């Protein structure tokens, strides 16, 4: 009887050890599976527009990334250039600013928004290739019936009119009788005058 008891005790002990071993293995596997994988944060890059240059085209919408209707601050961001403002000029309902290190281009601001872009630098051109120095005939040849010619203040204005008659945007080529001396992109009525602020009623 003593021998039987001893065998029983040995057998029981072996069973307990076998039952506990898988439990430890499962716990270890579970521990491995619940370990989160390392995470990689996405990299973000900020792309700034290139500075405004003569490679940017003048259109009925603006000049390069500078759009009609922008504030001066928005134009600085879009052009990649600071704007030079005379002291106290922002208190006026109409004033003119220039982009730093970009002579020959100015922006007329009416009631806080850019309404006219005045280009006198012959390096700039429209998206169709029109530029300062061209004759009136060359401008007419480029745009055909879209050009409306008007005598204005001792010169002539060759105005490009969009096909949509309700569109107030224009590009105006001012000629001294021989060749184009200025190109303006803007909205009527401001763009139709050599002095946009006078057209806006400032100083009257």
Model-predicted segments: where are they?
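A cross-family detector of function-defining hotspots
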Residues: 71-110, 136-181, 185-188, 203-204
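C-terminal motif of bacterial Sec signal peptides marking the signal peptidase cleavage site
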Residues: 6-9
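Sequence contexts marking disulfide-bonded cysteines in secreted/extracellular proteins
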Residues: 11, 93-95, 196-198
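Sec-dependent N-terminal signal peptides
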Residues: 1-2
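Acidic/histidine-rich, surface-exposed loop or edge segments in extracytoplasmic proteins
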Residues: 51-61, 114-123
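Glycine-centered tight-turn and secondary-structure capping sites
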Residues: 69, 127, 131-135
């Amino acid at each position: 009887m003593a021998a039987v008891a001893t065998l029983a005790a040995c057998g029981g002990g072996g069973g307990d050890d076998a039952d506990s071993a898988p439990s430890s293995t499962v716990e270890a596997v579970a521990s491995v599976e619940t370990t989160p994988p390392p995470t990689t944060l996405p990299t973000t890059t900020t792309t700034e527009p290139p500075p405004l240059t003569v490679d940017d085209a003048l259109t009925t919408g603006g000049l390069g990334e500078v759009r009609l209707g922008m504030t001066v601050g928005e134009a600085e961001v879009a052009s990649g250039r600071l704007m030079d403002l005379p002291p106290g000029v922002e208190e006026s309902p109409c004033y003119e600013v220039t982009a730093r290190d970009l002579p020959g281009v100015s922006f007329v601001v009416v009631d806080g928004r850019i309404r006219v872009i005045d280009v006198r630098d012959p390096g700039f051109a429209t998206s169709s290739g029109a530029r300062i120095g061209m004759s009136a005939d060359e401008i007419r040849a480029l745009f055909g019936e879209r050009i409306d010619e008007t005598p204005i203040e001792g010169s002539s204005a060759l105005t490009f009119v969009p096909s949509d008659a309700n569109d107030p945007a224009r590009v105006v080529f001012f000629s001294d009788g021989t060749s184009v001396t200025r190109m303006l992109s803007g909205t009527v009525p401001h763009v139709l005058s050599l002095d946009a602020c006078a057209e806006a009623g400032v100083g009257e």
